[in-house]
Amino acid sequence: MAKHEFALMDHVPQSGVRYDQYEGDHLICAVVDDDAIEQHLPGFEILPCYAHTVDIPCEGLCYCGITLIPPHAAGEMYRMVSHDSAFGELIPMLLRAEQEHKWIIHFGI
């Protein structure tokens, strides 16, 4: 089964830098099955995020690419999935990102 990976970033993404292969210290990693992501895609479309770099704003997750999720969007995502056990590893990461003002990087399928 296809998986989506998420990691808490150790720094704020910088303009002009692509994060196609983020190699920073991942403080926490979470894996979510594609089926669970697909069920929530319509709701995720309202999340203000960035595609590969903070220079390319987008809405929602880049399903097949890299998404940079800012802290406020992580909080919104947390409220969408906190009741869904399929997001078990990701739920505490989303909450931590919002509370500690950290970014999350998402690696799509």
Feature annotation, model-predicted:
Residues M1-W103, G108-I109:
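Acidic (Asp/Glu-rich) sequence patches and key acidic residues
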